[in-house]
Structure formats: structure tokens, C-alpha cells
UniProtKB/Swiss-Prot annotation:
The lineage of its organism: Bacteria, Pseudomonadati, Pseudomonadota, Gammaproteobacteria, Chromatiales. This is D-aminoacyl-tRNA deacylase. A Gly-cisPro motif from one monomer fits into the active site of the other monomer to allow specific chiral rejection of L-amino acids. Transmembrane segments: none annotated. NCBIfam families: D-aminoacyl-tRNA deacylase.
């Protein structure tokens, strides 16, 4: 599971001209679900997101977590994060989880986020979205949770 997190002052997601999610100060997290990802990877990512210290303390050091500053969390599915860009001039999306599984894992991640943290919003899996945000800093990090080891299958 791959996450690109950005510290923001505000963000919103629009689908078909309608704003479906909006947050104030907090984190926007673009999430790429890979083959082999499941609930354990979602749990580990969420654990890290809620405790990752990317907000400034009184001395200006990145020492405070999202929960410490009572910021908001906006999670947005983005399968392109799982692309293989190693060869050629066109990305391959083979490493990304198949859409039904990706949706299931993303929805699980968001449900767990809402259960653990009240200030959550989400983009819509499979939708063409417009994401607008004001990056604060800018502060941007990638987090990777390795997928479970897959065994070869014969078809």
C-alpha cells in the first residue's frame, strides 16, 4: 500500500461538479492499493497516518501528529500510485490491485479511519475526481506498507 500524504491548510474533492468532501487544516492522503494488500496493510497505514509527526510544535519542529493538532484527514483513492514506471513511456498498472479488491480495501481503510478518528472525509473510489488543496509548507511524504507475499497461482 502506497500513500502520498500532504499537510494542507484546506482541501476538497469534487465529482461531477459536486463537492463530496472538504477539510480544513490536516492531511490529504492519496492511497494506492497494490496486489497483495489487505486489511493488515490498511491497519498499519492508518496507524502510521494518525501518529506520523508532521505538524510543528511551539519550537517549529515537526513533533506533532494529526491527532495532536486535531487536524482533519482526507483519504483519496489513487490507483496510479501503484504504477510500474520502470520501462518505456507508458505506465503499467499491473501492480495495482484489481478494482473490486482495491475498492474493498479502500472502503475498509476509510471505515477504520472513521471508527478511530472523528475528523475524516474521503474521495470516491472509481470516480473521476478533482482534488484541490493548499499544501502547507509544502510538506509531502510517501509511506509504503509492503503487500503480503503472494504465492504463485496457476490458471
Amino acid at each position: 500500500m502506497i500513500a502520498l500524504l500532504q499537510r494542507v491548510t484546506q482541501a476538497q474533492v469534487t465529482v461531477a461538479g459536486e463537492v463530496i468532501a472538504r477539510i480544513g487544516p490536516g492531511l490529504v492522503v492519496l492511497v494506492g492499493i497494490e496486489r497483495g494488500d489487505g486489511p493488515p496493510q490498511a491497519e498499519r497505514l492508518l496507524e502510521r497516518l494518525l501518529s506520523y509527526r508532521v505538524f510543528a510544535d511551539s519550537k517549529g519542529h515537526m513533533n506533532l501528529s494529526l491527532a495532536d493538532v486535531e487536524g482533519a484527514l482526507l483519504v483519496v483513492p489513487q490507483f496510479t500510485l501503484a504504477a510500474d514506471t520502470g520501462k518505456g513511456t507508458r505506465p503499467s498498472f499491473t501492480p495495482a490491485a484489481p478494482p473490486p479488491l482495491g475498492k474493498q480495501i479502500f472502503e475498509y481503510l476509510f471505515a477504520q479511519a472513521k471508527a478511530r478518528y472523528s475528523r475524516c472525509a474521503a474521495g470516491r473510489f472509481g470516480a473521476h475526481m478533482q482534488l484541490s488543496l493548499t499544501n502547507d509548507g509544502p510538506v509531502t511524504f510517501t509511506l509504503q506498507i509492503p503487500p503480503a507475499v503472494q504465492t504463485a497461482t496457476t490458471e
